[in-house]
Amino acid sequence: AKRLSDLTGEPARTIHRLLEVDFTAKGELKFKRNETNPLPADVVIADEMSMVDALLMCSLVRAIKPTSKFIMVGDSNQLPSVGAGNVLKDLIASHYIPSVELKEIFRQAAQSLIVTNAHRIVNGEFPVLDDRQNDFFFMNKSLESDIAELVIQLAKQRLPDTYGFSPIDDIQVLCPTKMGMAGTKELNKQLQSALNPPSQNKAELKFFDVIFRTGDKVMQTKNMETVSNGDIGFV
């Protein structure tokens, strides 16, 4: 959405902000935009539609004028929304709306094993795990403590030494869970200790059980006026 906004010069907003989220006297969520107060736009483009649940989709459609165009963009193979419904996938499967599927990937090279394995997984096939000369590597560890130790080694030494990557600028660690020795909370502490250890010239601020230190890499987790969910910056 940010890229589209940069190209068109039109502002990009979250659906909640677009519909002007509000609350009732009982504290229940509602939207100011609806069928009696529709959006003024003649064309509405919604990105990341796989993340939109049934209730939010209902509110969005109610706020779009009957004469307007509604374009949905998204990957139906991504995880469905946290809320109820699998809106994008079900709409495509219904064949009630025209849809176009883009199959050529431009973000990675055509010979990328990441691309190959992505297609294999979508097609229900087992990914290629034994090609050590490409850009997709699988390392088998059973214990959480061993996983955490391997991640620290990869981020601090092995990947920077092999490919010349900057541990801070070029490497991003993704975790499926928050808790546990291999979850985000514990790994963040270990990565901070390994890549940005404390020193006298670095200011620190403790917020509950998290220490923020000058030089830390941080990610925004909530949409706000000047920053978006997922934006990365430094303390």
Write out the residue ranges for each language-model feature.
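Conserved helicase motor core of P-loop NTPases
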Residues: 76-225
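Residue-level recognition of short, solvent-exposed, well-ordered loop/turn junctions
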Residues: 39, 65, 211-214, 228
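Short beta-strand-centered aromatic/proline hotspots
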Residues: 229-235
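Conserved hydrophobic/aromatic pocket- or pore-lining residues that grip, position, or stack substrates
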Residues: 1-4, 14, 177, 215, ...
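ASCE P-loop NTPase helicase motor core
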Residues: 1-132
